[in-house]
Amino acid sequence: MSDMAINSVVVIHGPNLNLLGEREPKHYGTSTLDEINTKIQAEALQSNISVETFQSNSEADILNKIHSIKADFIIINPAAFTHTSVSIRDALAATKIPFIEVHLSNVFARESFRKESFFSDIAVGVISGFGAEGYLAALRYAAQKK
């Protein structure tokens, strides 16, 4: 990653993350997406970073969002698209904006198909298994580049 200052971050939440708080709490915890976004905003405020959060169940909407990003850094939880979306991978690579891949659950302790990511090899880093704290850790990493 270059030494450029990070002033703005976009957080992208992939499919089904709008169901957090009710969907498989054993894997994803009990926090809702709104609660996670509130924590992200609070962390960004402390770090004096502008942050935008975005969630979609649509691959096309996520692609369009990535294409339009003017931020310095991306934090993405591609969710189920982790294992299927070459197009999102290509969009992230094309933007040349550094990003961290985040997963709420430990994908390596789950089904074998979840262990393959189309994003990890081009990401600055991957955070998996720390619940909502993973987003905050990624934001702290971006903030230290300020």
Q: What function would you assign to each model-found segment?
A:
Residues N57-S58, A80, F130:
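Short beta->alpha linker loops
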Residues S68-I74:
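Short acidic/histidine-rich motifs immediately flanking catalytic phosphotransfer sites
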